[in-house]
Amino acid sequence: MKHKTWFALVFLLACLNGSGQSKVEKKDLMLPEVLTSNQGKRIRNAKMWIKKRRPEILQLFEDNLYGQVPKEVDSIRFNLKKEEHMAMNGKAKLKEIQIDVYRNKQSVTINLLLFIPANTSKPAPVFLLINHRGKDNTDPTRTLKSEFWPAEEVIARGYAIAAFHVSDVAIDHKETYHEGVLRLYPEQMTMGNGMKTIGAWAWGASRVMDYFEKDRDIDRSKVAVVGHSRGGKAALWAGAQDQRFATVISNDAGEAGAALSRHLIGETILDINTNFPHWFCDNYKKFNSNINALPIDQHMLIALMAPRAVYVASASEDKWADPVGEFLSLKYAEPVFNLFNLKPLPAPTQPAVNVPVKSSNLGYHLRTGIHNLTLYDWERFMDFISVPVK
């Protein structure tokens, strides 16, 4: 409690001084070293990172936080249920795709919505939203429109936009979450590092990626996976363990998402495991009251995306998600991107509200307002992926 109070005081004083970022140094946070192997060996180049350290860190996240994401399936089928060539008054083509995945005589169906710009002669880059909110946010008829998934605005910029609902793979409820994809992998339920809800949603995003690889209208080399809040946690994990995603976008993902757990602002490991015991693997609960025993922190998750592109978005009034901790995760992941000769963010400290910053492969903004996914956020995401990745 003393540590929590001290960090909160530092954060408050920093805000009063006109800066959103606390002055806590990396050494004060006692973060695990991202460029030191489990055997204590320093990682000095990209080859060492890819061969040695990246697999270690991925395994640590599987074993201690998200659980393993099973890869094996008996079969997967893609069925185009509907195709409308004059969607959005002729500005887009709509596809509704049914993705059926089979294993152990069980199956799960993911219903994918996909809008593609009509005025393009080449495969389109696509944003994939992991939607954990109401399905009315992704209304395919466009009778209902939502900034949470602003399909018209994205199409107007020349990008495709897609979404699936998380309930197709795992219902977000502690009593029924296992009734989806986990029927295909019942062995996960009894394992300390078994996949739970967040891992299941990431698994679903990868099955959508399987489909994108088959659709000639989509540029499979330019797929951005997007998630807000708990969906942001899933997007980050999907991007970490599935390197086919070219860009990973986290919006207000907070604890066990983009925010450093050791920053001790807002939601804690104990909070999240108490309120949402079905989200993460059982092993994560070991760290409820012993955070410094956790061999990872979220800067290491973001580092797993290197050399691909990562964007983190925060909201000024969303203290529960710890905007400063989210920014610091990006900053402390930069040494890994440096191994690939990629430039750091052009901001040593958290930027001012509504002043986005980006390099070729890293981006961040702090939006005015509450915990939400808005058109302002989407506009910044589109600006970001328009930057050539070097």
Regions found by a protein language model. Name each.
Residues S250-L301, E326-T349, P356:
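Mobile cap/lid helix-loop segments that gate and shape the active-site cleft of serine hydrolases
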Residues M1-K23:
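Bacterial Sec-dependent N-terminal signal peptides
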Residues G134, T138-P140, S206-E267, N290:
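Primarily recognizes the serine-hydrolase "nucleophile elbow" in alpha/beta-hydrolase
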Residues R367, L375-K390:
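Catalytic active-site module of serine/aspartate enzymes centered on a nucleophile-bearing elbow/loop
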Residues A87-T141:
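Glycine-rich active-site/cofactor-binding loop and its immediate structural neighborhood
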Residues A306-A321, R367-T368:
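Conserved strand-to-loop "acid loop" that flanks and positions the catalytic carboxylate
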Residues G20-N111, S386-V389:
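N-terminal targeting or regulatory segments adjacent to alpha/beta-hydrolase or S9 domains
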Residues K122, V126-D215, S261-R262:
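Cap/lid segment of the alpha/beta-hydrolase catalytic domain
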